[in-house]
């Protein structure tokens, strides 16, 4: 095939028909469909993908843009490169060529190492730029790869925009950075236009937030270092380094976010907390909780992203099976008593509570919450926030809510004796109380209440049940494979319980869909313990933790590790992941 030839829709359709991937009818449909002004700018593969055709060689699979890109890569004999933005070194990639050269030729550097540079394009036969680039990059070799048109059109302008924003901020003078820039940022709410450097910071902050939403991050970490700061995202419970930027640029980014969160920009010596509202790329309103911390190299900022889909997520999506769902719903239908959800920070406790309250919050009941902070605004709850500045704690909040004629009270966390006692008083006076504790498993919550100073007979009289939970990463459905089981690890996980050992289980591999991690998304595993008469008697008699666990086992209550083992058998997660997350004692 001849170089310097730009593929068009006609060429693609003829080749697809020749290869038996589309029918004559499909070709005619695409050729005779009118394109509007915007669609005329599309790449041929994007226009063909628009019709959602079936791949005639694999009738069960649609001809989406990725599949069409794979076909074109095979056709022209080039590898298809899928950009993983989490692993891209934007500074290095954009230094390969100027933005003008990249935009003019519709190419992008996607990987750089000492011997060669990978250059991505969506027009594999247009190569009149190669000789010029080889000359400027010698002695490094150039290797051509094919990019999906969607990826090229997104990351080509985005990479250069981010790089330009960082460099513009880096080149500002010390006076501009420390004074003029911050003053201009403070005026962003007015009608005045900030200078160029500050506008770059605004764009950089927007890119960080939108990128975090797209990647499904739960937390954003902005971490200062001596020379270069780091931007990290927590995705599926694991931190990924996204970007390195000069320390002064990161400082300006943090200042911008502090202003948006209404924090004191000048105060960098003590921790601060705040919130900001923004919108996701899908247009959903979401909130971020901000927390700053003074460190040796400057102020560190962590943003916790509250998932706007939390309140519309079903229990099945959270990981509840049919039996657990019935038990949990029966427990939450009680008119009074205490229900606890336990687990470490980030284990999904708040999501479970919100989902439960959403079902309970009908027009016939008054649902009140006291939280620190309010994690998700919901119109069917009456939500109240703890405020240490005015001495409004959880215990004070519960005391105030008791005078508001509540039916159901949600206490964000029982962390001291006063809060525990107020929750018990609320339960004794005819209210249903839902709250959280930080314990490793369900039986431990009983001894934890005792440690907080709650009288055992009061715990026995008011506690209805406990749900302990963890979040495990789900295996990527696109690449998981069966492999032989590690018998020793399986026996370690299921000790003292009779669960048949399978010969093979699914494990992680890694592909473009899961960023080579082998996992995509997370799901809950649960240990549910309802307090029957025997357990209540043990609690009243101040039984130790081993006695409580023994009685729970007699009742058929299965620990978290067994719930994890069942998820392994279902092919949902891996043995290594469950062993990483659950307590084995």
Curated annotation (Swiss-Prot):
ATP binds at residues 346-351. Keywords: ATP-binding, Cytoplasm, Metal-binding, Nucleotide-binding, Zinc. SUPFAM superfamilies: EspE N-terminal domain-like (SSF160246), P-loop containing nucleoside triphosphate hydrolases (SSF52540). The keyword NADP does not apply. Disruption phenotype: Disruption of the gene reduces transformation rates by two orders of magnitude. Natural transformation is undetectable in the pilB-tfpB double mutant. The tfpB-pilT mutant makes very few T4P. The pilB-tfpB-pilT triple mutant produces no detectable T4P fibers. Zn(2+) binds at residues 476, 479, 511, 514. It is found in: Cytoplasm. GO terms for molecular function: ATP binding; ATP hydrolysis activity; metal ion binding. Its main location: cytoplasm. It holds the Pfam family T2SSE. One of its GO terms (cellular component) is cytoplasm. Coiled coil: none annotated. Belongs to the GSP E family. Both PilB and TfpB are essential for optimal T4P production, with each motor playing a distinct role in T4P extension. Overexpression of tfpB does not restore the transformation defect of a pilB mutant. ATPase component of the type IV pilus (T4P). Acts as a molecular motor to provide the energy that is required for biogenesis of the pilus and the extrusion of substrates generated in the cytoplasm. TfpB is required for optimal T4P extension and, consequently, efficient natural transformation. May play a role in initiating T4P extension. This is Type IV pilus assembly ATPase TfpB.
